[in-house]
Amino acid sequence: MSAQPVDIQIFGRSLRVNCPPDQRDALNQAADDLNQRLQDLKERTRVTNTEQLVFIAALNISYELAQEKAKTRDYAASMEQRIRMLQQTIEQALLERGRITEKTNQNFE
C-alpha cells in the first residue's frame, strides 16, 4: 500500500501529509490529540505564540515517550527475571523428580 496525501488541521493550520490508507484513522486521532494538547497548553500557560506552544507540546510528548520507554525497559527486565526464576524452579523440580524416580527404581530392584 502506498501512502496517499491526507489533509489534517493542526491548531487552525491546514497540513497535507502522506499516509498509508490503513493508518489514516490513527493519523486523525494523533492530530486530534495534538490539537487538544495545544489548546490545553494555551489555556494553562497563556502563551499565544503558536510556534512556542508547538515546541512546548513537542517537549512534553518527547518526555512522555521517554518515560514510557523507561517503563517498558523496566517491565521487560522484570519479566526476564521472572522467566529465569520460573526456569530455575522447573529445572529444580525436574531434578528432584528425577532423584525420586531413581530412588523408587532402586527400591524395586
Curated annotation (Swiss-Prot):
It is found in: Cytoplasm. The keyword Cytoplasm applies. Residues 21-100 form a coiled coil. Keywords: Cell cycle, Cell division, Coiled coil, Cytoplasm, Septation. It holds the Pfam family ZapA. The keyword Cell division applies. Homodimer. Interacts with FtsZ. This is Cell division protein ZapA. It comes from Shigella dysenteriae serotype 1 (strain Sd197).
